[in-house]
């Protein structure tokens, strides 16, 4: 297994909470995406969004921000438009997105190693989208 980094573009709304908008594989594509989709063309501003998590405000109740997370890849190659799995710690009213996985087998191995208290049944339910008290798994298509 290989470990790299991916970028999550996360949308936050005061009523709906957080959701992942895009998963992008490299900084150049992220820069282009932010430049094309938001009224932010200043390189320093985009660098601050990427490097320091500075939010891009849409209005008083919603914004986007970027988070860089670990990506653990199995043997298969992940291409744009393939689904990747995202592990998140559930907090009071939000999520802390921690790691992205190339496929469910890699995710299951990770859960087995890092969360040995989870039974096989609990791991399979979690991967299938049935969250536990502390963890949640989602999946989204890789943008680029």
Spans of model-derived segments:
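Non-transmembrane, interaction-prone segments in cytosolic or luminal domains
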Residues: 7-9, 26-27, 92, 103, ...
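Short amphipathic alpha-helices within nucleic acid-binding modules
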Residues: 30-33, 106-111
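Ordered, small/hydrophobic-rich secondary-structure cores
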Residues: 1-45
């Amino acid at each position: 297994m290989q470990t790299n980094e991916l970028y999550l573009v996360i949308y936050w709304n005061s009523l709906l909470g957080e959701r992942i908008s895009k998963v992008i594989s490299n900084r150049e594509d992220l820069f282009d995406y932010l430049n094309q989709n938001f009224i932010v063309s200043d390189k320093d501003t985009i660098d601050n969004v990427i490097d320091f998590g500075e939010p891009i405000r849409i209005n008083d109740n919603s914004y986007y921000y970027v988070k860089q997370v670990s990506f653990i890849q199995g043997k298969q190659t992940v291409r744009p438009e393939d689904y990747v799995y995202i592990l998140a710690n559930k907090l009071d009213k939000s999520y802390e997105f921690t790691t992205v996985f190339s496929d469910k087998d890699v995710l299951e191995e990770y859960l087995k190693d890092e969360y040995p208290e989870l039974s096989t049944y609990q791991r399979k339910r979690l991967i299938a989208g049935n969250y536990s008290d502390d963890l949640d798994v989602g999946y989204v298509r890789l943008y680029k």
